[in-house]
Amino acid sequence: MQLNSTEISDLIKQRIESFNVVSEARNEGTIVSVSDGIIRIHGLADVMQGEMIELPGNRYALALNLERDSVGAVVMGPYADLREGMKVTGTGRILEVPVGPELLGRVVNTLGEPIDGKGPIGAKQTSPVEVIAPGVIDRKSVDQPVQTGYKSVDSMIPIGRGQRELIIGDRQTGKTALAIDAIINQKNSGIYSIYVAIGQKASTIANVVRKLEEHGALKNTIVVVASASESAALQYLAPYSGCAMGEYFRDRGEDALIVYDDLSKQAVAYRQISLLLRRPPGREAFPGDVFYLHSRLLERAARVNEEYVERFTKGEVKGKTGSLTALPIIETQAGDVSAFVPTNVISITDGQIFLQTELFNAGVRPAVDPGISVSRVGGAAQTKIVKKLSGGIRTALAAYRELAAFAQFSSDLDEATKRQLTHGQKVTELMKQKQYAPMSVFDQALVIFAAERGYLTDVELNKVLDFEAALLSYARAHYAELAAQIDKTGAYNDEIEAQLKKLVDDFKATQTW
């Protein structure tokens, strides 16, 4: 076989063209100190803020302090075997976590790795944990409800899709219980839920996961865990990871609800990291940017308009708005809402549900204080029937609290005051609700209708809850069609009012409570 020079030169050219060599220039640095999970690195001149730094042993650190001649980074994972002189490399990318419907029903850590023993997740997409929140033009006003299933919340402090509603109170006042019930109530509402547990005991988290599974809500929920035994870095990053998972649904025209339980522990973890990085401490030893820590997280909870969703999905989803509703939880010390972190989060959110120890200990559960709890934007999203009927509930409770304090000093009260006190006591009793027993729109509307139209006047105080239970079971047995109609539409008109009146009159005639 003879080859001429042209063929040889063509063959060589072909080989050269198909030869593929990839050269990758990566920044390299050297560890100069390791202490308390913080490493100082010499070199890495063009590292970014928040960049992932690759360490020996398939671990990563997060660059947080960019100084003149060194980089301060926090290690995500064990650091006992890291030594001075070890080589590290910059990755050129910031932290990303897996996102998508594959995560529903799973328990993951801050990095999106499964920790529930159910095998790999197989998510098809990842998303950066730090994303800039949608701008003003991309947002739409809140006008659709998120039903928590609690009478006291849905009637007096309504929450809308895309709202940020703070749940605040001392330890052991039922904050987590309220949030978990809100998640359970979404199992058939089409709203996906994300529960982020920060700095909690592993046994507490396991109990929450079991309850969600028992009530059939885990299949629509992602649980993100940074337990008390995890490093401060993972506790600090967990809310951002959960938020990225929630934004996946928001940006595709779906609705999601995220619970941060709780942001006080995240702030403490961030304080720990900041002090170890030698950042100057401020009030309560928190760093100066602790407000920004929470504001950039909570601003990502929003309702986005149709144009935003269409642009994001490149025209795949048309005519749908998306929302991410946030329920951040803050733990106060002895009811002190004027501390640094509580005041910050109150000023960022669109309202707060304040839970009081005194009410909780008095058996009023959920222990919502209607006097200082407020929803700034939820009124527009409230179900029409509940909005129409519940106007007098807050007023009755506020007047009752005022009169109850006044009545302690006076024995001879006039009839009108006595009536108001009795009505207030009965409404307070009626607002009580058991855990894991969320109520439908119809159930809430019926109970509030009975209270507002004076049907409780001849019911003894200790029989109010029995009256409620009997009324609801009677309604379900005899007025199932009306119940289905109200649950579906939430509408209220003269015809529905007449039917509700007939229902309660018929029930009272039976005297079966």
Swiss-Prot record:
Alphabetical list of HAMAP family matching this protein: ATP_synth_alpha_bact
Name of the top EC class for this enzyme: translocase
Covalent S-S links between cysteines: none
Site (Required for activity): S373
Keywords: ATP synthesis, ATP-binding, Cell inner membrane, Cell membrane, CF(1), Hydrogen ion transport, Ion transport, Membrane, Nucleotide-binding, Translocase, Transport
InterPro entries named in the record: ATP_synth_asu-like_sf, ATP_synth_asu_C, ATP_synth_asu_C_sf, ATP_synth_F1_a_nt-bd_dom, ATP_synth_F1_asu, ATPase_a/bsu_AS, ATPase_F1/V1/A1_a/bsu_N, ATPase_F1/V1/A1_a/bsu_N_sf
Species per Swiss-Prot/TrEMBL record: Vibrio cholerae serotype O1 (strain ATCC 39315 / El Tor Inaba N16961)
Protein location: Cell inner membrane
NCBIfam families: atpA, PRK13343.1
Gene3D superfamilies: 2.40.30.20, ATP synthase alpha/beta chain, C-terminal domain, P-loop containing nucleotide triphosphate hydrolases
Similarity section: Belongs to the ATPase alpha/beta chains family.
Residues spanning the membrane: none
One BP annotation, GO: proton motive force-driven ATP synthesis
Catalytic activity: ATP + H2O + 4 H(+)(in) = ADP + phosphate + 5 H(+)(out)
Transport among keywords: yes
Binding site for ATP: G169, D170, R171, Q172, T173, G174, K175, T176
Protein origin, superkingdom: Bacteria
Protein name, per record: ATP synthase subunit alpha
